[in-house]
Amino acid sequence: LTPRTEEKEGHHVRIKIINPNTTWSMTEKIGACARAVAHAGTEIVAVSPAMGPVSIESHYDEALAVPGLLQEIAAGERDGIDGYVIACFGDPGLKAARELARGPVVGIAEAAMHLASMVASRFSVVTTLGRTMGQAWHLAEIYGMERFCANVRACELPVLELEEPGSNARERIVDECRRALDEDGSDCIVLGCAGMTDLCEHIAGLLGVPVIDGVAAGTKLIESLVTLKLKTSKHGELARPLPKTMMGALEGFTLRG
């Protein structure tokens, strides 16, 4: 048998999973999910930024999550991280992160939708709040997944309710997934929030269809890209940003030549 690349070269894969919100209980859950699917030779580093919103439920929240996310990408580059997963279904800051990173970066919506299109003819996204449905549709369009996406559904469930003991969040999500299969003509479910990551196997067992969590999907995609030695292209749009002075509160984001 031929040794795996990381064994042959004495290097194990290091993947940084960035939860762009600052709720550590969710980050721990996300990290546990990634470790459960990662290869034994892969190190998972799960983090939350030092600054940002406690949850991401609007365009405003998403915009304010990006600076802390980019700080974590920059730190990962200093620490020798091989690849990154952005663990928020809005895929915030994805292209900016790719500009900073040498290795591959994927968002969980991007990863989940692409994998869903490979195992089903149509999928439904089940997310938290109705106000985020437009962003999910937008991502489906820009990723070329709109023709596979039968519907985007919301449980009207605040993100942090997923972290509350005794919450009926699980039952509400399962009910919405069941309605998606009955009403949308879909044959696969994409979970539209990183906070749902621990529900994937439970829902799949109940419904008997593929249920895709973007954290697991993103972790395995990054592992594959790193194994194939595919890095973010630095020719053209995703080249490192030009050196530029940042002012005021953004002074720490100044890039030197």
Short names for language-model regions:
Residues R98-V119, H202-I222:
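Short, acidic/small-residue loops that bind anionic groups at enzyme active sites
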Residues L1-H12:
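Short, Lys/Arg-enriched N-terminal segments with co-localized hydrophobic residues
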Residues A46-I73, L160-P165:
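N-terminal beta-loop-helix "entrance" segment that forms/cooperates
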Residues A63-G80, E171-G185:
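Short, well-structured alpha-helical segments in soluble
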Residues S25, S117-C155, N168-E171, S224-G257:
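Short, glycine-/small-residue-rich phosphate/pyrophosphate-handling segment
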Residues I15-V37:
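N-terminal beta1-alpha1 ligand-phosphate binding loop
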Residues W137-G192, L199:
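Active-site rim beta-loop-alpha module in soluble metabolic enzymes
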Residues I17-I18, R78-C88, G185-A194:
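Periplasmic-binding protein-like
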